[in-house]
Amino acid sequence: MKTLTFYTLLLCAALYSNFFDCKAVADAELPKLPDDKVLIRSRSNCPKGKVWNGFDCKSPFAFSKK
């Protein structure tokens, strides 16, 4: 049982430190994307045959089945 507690604490510490690393990166000025890399913000920007899954354009079969 002590081993499980140790690993749980270790995982929490890793996630906690990762949170601050991510925040620091988000607060820093991020590099701009090249002109050919356009951020997809809505399903209307998806190419034909792809659908919006909330994050990016994917094949409808990639996330329709659970």
From Swiss-Prot:
Localization recorded for this chain is: Secreted
Q: Per its UniProt entry, which superkingdom is the organism in?
A: Eukaryota
**Gene Ontology terms: biological process:** defense response to fungus; defense response to Gram-negative bacterium; killing of cells of another organism
Q: Name one GO cellular component term.
A: extracellular region
| Disulphide-bridged cysteine pairs | 46-57
* Major localisation: secreted
Signal sequence residues? 1-26
Q: Does the keyword Secreted apply?
A: yes
Keyword Transmembrane tagged = no
Molecular function via GO? chitin binding
Which InterPro entries does the record associate with it? Answer: Chitin-bd_dom_sf (IPR036508)
- Which keywords are on file for this protein? Antibiotic, Antimicrobial, Chitin-binding, Disulfide bond, Fungicide, Secreted, Signal
Please give the function described in this protein's UniProt entry.
Possesses antifungal activity against phytopathogenic fungi such as P.oryzae, R.solani and B.cinerea but not against phytopathogenic bacteria. Shows weak activity against the insect pathogenic fungus B.bassiana and against S.aureus. Binds chitin.
- This chain belongs to the protein called Scarabaecin
Taxonomic source organism: Oryctes rhinoceros
